[in-house]
Amino acid sequence: MTGRKTAGKKAAGGLPEPAPAARQRFRRTLLRWYDRNGRDLPWRRTDDPYHILVSEIMLQQTQVDRVLPKYHEWLGKFPSFHALADAGEEAAVRTWYPLGYNIRPRRLHAIAREAVASYGGRLPDDEATLRSFKGIGPYTAGALMSFAFRRRAPILDTNVARVLFRVIVGRGDLKSHRMKRHLWKVSALMVPHRRAFDFNQAIMDFGALVCTARRPKCEGCPMSGMCRAYPFDPASGDAPR
């Protein structure tokens, strides 16, 4: 199978890592696809860290089409960290409705209060300090570094993990801690020095639109020639093999 050529070596744990040529091929293929098919979303038209944080917290466990109207409503009511911190936690929870998972607006409000109290209503632009905020984990910190501060930073949400697992690794337990650690390493290797912002947006879109969880569009997929899970078997899914 041609897809077996994607990985160039194995990491210390025995999991495949992409060789430099495979990384370049993956990047070119993904960015070419994104230039034609990428989604036009409002949080991609801003580098305001607050706006991007709001979108990232909302998108946790909630589909894009449900987030879009609430994102605009939220920013209309709470346009800044200062406005959110001043509004109070219960106002944030009420405005969040009906997105659910109400721990999210409470965390967002707590982040706003800390940003106002300690950083003048801004977010710091280094990953370690971002991760010191309660409610900002590795993915959200990476997303802020990439999308708000335009740094070359890896991300690993559900969509990104699925794409990298299928194309680069191909077998194993996607949900294991060992695999997640490995995929973070792969994500860091994959992010290019140029167009890092576009690359991270592209891989999320690719996972959402093509390399989906249950019924990926393998037929005609631009990654099929390098994908180690191609053709994907819906019966086995991403279970250990």
Locate the predicted segments by residue.
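Catalytic cores of DNA base-excision repair glycosylases
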Residues: 15-22, 28-29, 33-235
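Polybasic, lysine-enriched low-complexity intrinsically disordered terminal tails
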Residues: 1-17, 238-239
